Each structure stands twice: as structure tokens, then as C-alpha cells.
């Protein structure tokens, strides 16, 4: 069963920020047309339905192309994906390779490797999906992925606040999204009841009634990443064509939005609508998922 769509009216808003990270600038006015967005990220159960109906094989389940990785040992080109692995203690936060490992056999069915499964995670957002996997699901569903502008417009929920829920990170001490609780990357206190992804819909909706726009998993958009916003005319801010057909291009990075359960104030203060991060199209990880959008039905 596909996720319920929430109709958004479209309009103009101030996109970006100059308060946190340089790639979020400049602040600029963007206009998006009316569209509909899925209320929550695509879940494991929904992605399983897609795979069952189509026989689709994700990027993480396919051997790596030796031509794209010259000099890499053939034994290291087996199917797999990136898995977050907590460190034993405090580390230099400038080197992400200390807490990310390439794990053979990791994929959406086995997000942490061959010995893991999703038997008790049907309602969690699907992870270990690369960009073409998200595009394929969206096409099957008769939908598409959002542009970065559409995603940020939806996440803001009709406000100009710093966070999707207001200007305070923890209003009244309340945790508003599934983000890292403890000291990154070695101790997660599990204060929210989960260490890792949480079932969708466990936190308050934003002003548009959308769930999990912030935290839990980063979400793919169709917008290629540049180290600052590219200012496009308002008429082109929505519905950018998806250039990808059936294969990922590791030389192209897409823009991720929303932050994830691995975001912490001291490392990745990106659990905000304006925040953005690059990710190569061919990479699947334990903290990236997606949701779809749809255009209004004409008639």
C-alpha cells in the first residue's frame, strides 16, 4: 500500500540559511507549484511490495563495476553497502571513515550485513537504497522524487522557523525528531527508545501534517548538489527532470535533506529544513531513505 499523499498549495518561500553551514547559503526566494507529498518516508514493507511486484534488484545487491573502481581488488567489488559502526570512544570528527564501514552483503533486506534482517522493522523507513533505487520505486508508484526546493518547502510546514517545529531545538525539553542522543559517534543513550531508525510517525507532524521530515533518515532529492545554492528563476524551481535512467553515476552527487538519526549538535547539526548534504548516486547507507511526491491530477 502506497503512502497517503498530502496536497500542498504551492507558493513562494525563503529557502536556505546563513546561520549554520556555508552550503546552505544564500537565502533566496523560491516559488514552487502545487504538488502532493507522501506523509511519511517509504517503509520497508512498502519497498518489499515494490520488489515483490517487479523483481527489482537494488544497487547494493549488484556487484560493483570494476571499470568504475580501477585498482580495487576484485574481492572488494562484491555486493554490499555502507554501515554505521560506533567507535570505541571519542575520535577526530573530521574523518568519517572511522565510523563508516563497507559491509559485504548489506542491502535493504539486510541493512547491517548478511546476519541482519528487517523482520521487526516493517514500519521503519527503508534504508540501503541508492538514488536509482528510489527513482525506480517512485516510477513504479506513479510518482516521483522531490526537488530540493519542494522538499524544503514541505519540511518548513508553512513557517520560516529554524526547525520544522519552531525556533527552539527542544521546546520544553521535548525531543521532536529521531536524532543522535549522547556523544557522537561512540555513545547513543537511546533516550528516544531506539538506537538507529525508528518506526515512521513517532514524532509530531509539522504544519502541513507531514511526518519524519526531520531526523530518522536523510531523504534523496532530484537536485544535484553544489557547494552553495544555485539561484534559478522561480519558474524552474519545481519539477526538475530526472536525468538518471537505470544506472547510477558515481561522479554525480544528489542533494540529501532532513538529517538522520546520526545527526548530533557537535557533528551534524543538520536536522533542519535548510540543511543539505551531498551523496553520490551509487551509495547506499544505513541512514538514507526517501519519500515520493506527485503532481496535481489535471482535468
From Swiss-Prot:
Q: Does the keyword Transferase apply?
A: no
Q: Name one GO biological process term.
A: post-translational protein modification
- One Pfam family for this entry, by name? FGE-sulfatase
Reaction(s) catalyzed by this protein?
Answer: L-cysteinyl-[sulfatase] + 2 a thiol + O2 = an organic disulfide + 3-oxo-L-alanyl-[sulfatase] + hydrogen sulfide + H2O + H(+)
Q: Where is the signal peptide?
A: none
The record lists Cu cation as bound by 263, 268
Q: In which pathway does it act?
A: Protein modification; sulfatase oxidation
The UniProt transmembrane annotation reads: none
Keywords recorded for this protein, A-Z: Copper, Metal-binding, Oxidoreductase
Cofactor note as given = The catalytic copper is required to activate oxygen and catalyze oxidative C-H activation.
Gene3D superfamilies in alphabetical order = paralog of FGE (formylglycine-generating enzyme) (3.90.1580.10)
Cofactor list: Cu cation
Q: Which InterPro entries match?
A: CTDL_fold, Sulfatase_Mod_Factor_Kinase, SUMF_dom, SUMF_sf
Q: Does the keyword Oxidoreductase apply?
A: yes
* UniProt note: phenotype after gene disruption: Cells are viable and do not display growth defects. They however show reduced sulfatase activity.
Q: What class of enzyme is it?
A: oxidoreductase
Which EC number applies?
1.8.3.7
Q: Which GO terms describe its molecular function?
A: formylglycine-generating oxidase activity; metal ion binding
Q: Which family does it belong to?
A: Belongs to the sulfatase-modifying factor family.
This molecule's function is given as: Oxidase that catalyzes the conversion of cysteine to 3-oxoalanine on target proteins. 3-oxoalanine modification, which is also named formylglycine (fGly), occurs in the maturation of arylsulfatases and some alkaline phosphatases that use the hydrated form of 3-oxoalanine as a catalytic nucleophile.
User: What is this protein identified as?
Assistant: Formylglycine-generating enzyme
User: Organism, per UniProt?
Assistant: Mycobacterium tuberculosis (strain ATCC 25618 / H37Rv)
Source taxonomy: Bacteria, Bacillati, Actinomycetota, Actinomycetes, Mycobacteriales
